[in-house]
Amino acid sequence: MDVHGKKASIIGAKRSGVAAAELLAKSGAKVFVSELGEPGASEAERLADCGIPWEQDGHTDRVCDADFCVVSPGIPRTAGIIRRVLEQGIPLYSEIEAASWFCKARIAGITGTDGKTTTSTLLHRIAEADGMKNDYRAFSVGNIGVPFSSLVLDMAPADLAVVELSSYQLEGCETFRPDVSVITNITPDHLDRYNGDMQLYAAAKFRIYASQRASDTLVYNFDDPLLRAQFSGNGRGFPFRIVPFGIGNDVPGSGSEEAFFYDEGMIRHLTAKGISEVFSGEDFLKSSFRGRHNIYNALAALAAAAALGIEESVARKAISGFSGVEHRQEFVCSLDGVEWINDSKATNVNALLQALDAVPGSIVLIAGGRDKGNDYTVLFDVVRRKVVTVIAIGEAREKILQVFEGITRTAGADTLDDAVALARESAEKGQTVLFSPGCASFDMFENFEERGRLFKRSILALNPC
């Protein structure tokens, strides 16, 4: 899209909004930024350096004096300013969409409810290794932390942009076209944004492939019921190539000509030539990178790498040296025979369930935060089998205590420090303390990263590991 001379309003002056503003201004657009609150000092300085005008403490009618608008991902379609923009027929895009207009590089897009950051990190690691051999660069951008707009002008045609995508970022995508798209899974999350409608949430995720063509590839989790219904059976008429991944020997029967699957301790690759063994799951399921969910993450990354033409030997070596991502079932330390695991990124019940499945032995669970309408009853079976104590915190504390009363021992804590102290008292040698909230962090913390860091700090304050 040629933006030169066009008027662009950016709604939201946080990290991605300011990055989009800078990109569009450099590309010749007449940019205006509107922020409901107040831009941070760094963001205000960047806008001033580019000569971009902005308003704060509210949105005026000037926002609608635009040829198009770019909205920050945290602003829902129900916000008053967004309704005004749409009512006036002004095109509304996401920062990802705007950045894609200027992208010369290949794109691998990764979305899903859970696993997208680990899968993105794995694929980026694989691509970096391949790029060293084949003279290209791999960039990691998007929901993972660095806005796509910040780096897109640095990318050459041979390079690869690994773009992690939330449903919020995909909502405003119209022409965004990944060469390879990956959907890790779709389970209930963020439904407050979608009026409790799972189909609306899924539709936002499915925008990742809306512009893909015959030369492109979609990689999806065959074991996810919603995704299987959408994509299995010879591609269901989609124009692009479809590659499923999953656990078990039923994946090759998905109807696709190619698949990656884990069976009998081995990752295998189905092609027209037959089934080959990629490598043993034990090679990457180490103490710091373990669990069934990480098999899925590895399968997704391997399938995406293959679709990008990366040799399996390169991918295998890169994955074998991977130690995981911070706040995602992160081993913190062993203290008096008790292992402590930080899974602060578990912001929904499905992620909590995966963590409980992944951790061997008896567990003291610290959970809670801002509830998202969670159904904790799906955890009953694994809690009965593995959890000796549930320690509940945050706004969801009373709900969690009530749900698990009679299922296992329960206790409430006012603060995270108190919860850690209770866990220290409760856990016995050979057990694991798992911090996997299953809830959003915003009732007590700035974000899940701060929550995880404070959990680790609290452990180390008890006794340096």
Curated annotation (Swiss-Prot):
Its main location: cytoplasm. GO terms for molecular function: ATP binding; UDP-N-acetylmuramoylalanine-D-glutamate ligase activity. Coiled coil: none annotated. It is found in: Cytoplasm. ATP binds at G112, T113, D114, G115, K116, T117, T118. Its EC number is 6.3.2.9. The keyword Nucleus does not apply. The lineage of its organism: Bacteria, Pseudomonadati, Chlorobiota, Chlorobiia, Chlorobiales. It catalyses: UDP-N-acetyl-alpha-D-muramoyl-L-alanine + D-glutamate + ATP = UDP-N-acetyl-alpha-D-muramoyl-L-alanyl-D-glutamate + ADP + phosphate + H(+). It comes from the Bacteria. InterPro entries: Mur-like_cat_sf (IPR036565), Mur_ligase_C (IPR004101), Mur_ligase_C_dom_sf (IPR036615), Mur_ligase_cen (IPR013221), MurD (IPR005762). This is UDP-N-acetylmuramoylalanine--D-glutamate ligase. PANTHER family: UDP-N-ACETYLMURAMOYLALANINE--D-GLUTAMATE LIGASE. Keywords: ATP-binding, Cell cycle, Cell division, Cell shape, Cell wall biogenesis/degradation, Cytoplasm, Ligase, Nucleotide-binding, Peptidoglycan synthesis. Pathway: Cell wall biogenesis; peptidoglycan biosynthesis. Cell wall formation. Catalyzes the addition of glutamate to the nucleotide precursor UDP-N-acetylmuramoyl-L-alanine (UMA). One of its GO terms (cellular component) is cytoplasm. GO terms for biological process: cell division; cell wall organization; peptidoglycan biosynthetic process; regulation of cell shape. The gene is murD. Belongs to the MurCDEF family.
